[in-house]
Amino acid sequence: MAIRIGITGGIGSGKSVVSKILSLLDIPIYLSDDEAKRLTATDETIRRELTDLLGDELYQGGILNKQKLANYLFASADNAEKINAIIHPQVKQDFRRWCTCHSASQFVALESAILFESGFDSEVDVVVMVYAPQE
């Protein structure tokens, strides 16, 4: 099994730069933000649970109403916890499947701005914390 590298850091810290460097070394990169967006739009479990929480109009014509989701998500910390409790487990499951697909690789990497906050640190073997000063 591949060694799983977690890449995290604040906004503008250079996570994407580190990911690109690792990618140049042929290390597969799982971009958790992108995958969470993809799963929120397509995963049946997420769609069902979000619809149960926010109503059928969340997916209009099968398309996610991002504004409605964002309005709810950012209205309170409690709302964010509810949304994260729906999405994060599915992203973790997807990451595990993705790792299985890349099991022949020596290393794989997971880029996540909220690696620790989301509990994804338990999914990786080593963490790279990216930090860049403001100047």
Regions found by a protein language model. Name each.
Residues 5-7:
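Hydrophobic anchor at the beta1->P-loop junction of P-loop NTPases
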Residues 10, 22:
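P-loop (Walker A) phosphate-binding loop of NTP-binding proteins
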Residues 13:
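ATP-binding Walker
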Residues 16:
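Walker A/P-loop
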Residues 23-32, 44-45:
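Post-Walker A helix-loop "phosphate-sensing" segment adjacent to the P-loop in P-loop NTPases
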Residues 25, 54, 123-124:
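Short, structured coil segments at secondary-structure junctions
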Residues 37-106:
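ATP-dependent small-molecule kinase phosphotransfer cores
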Residues 94-101, 107-135:
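ATP-dependent NMP and nucleoside kinases share a basic, alpha-helical "lid"
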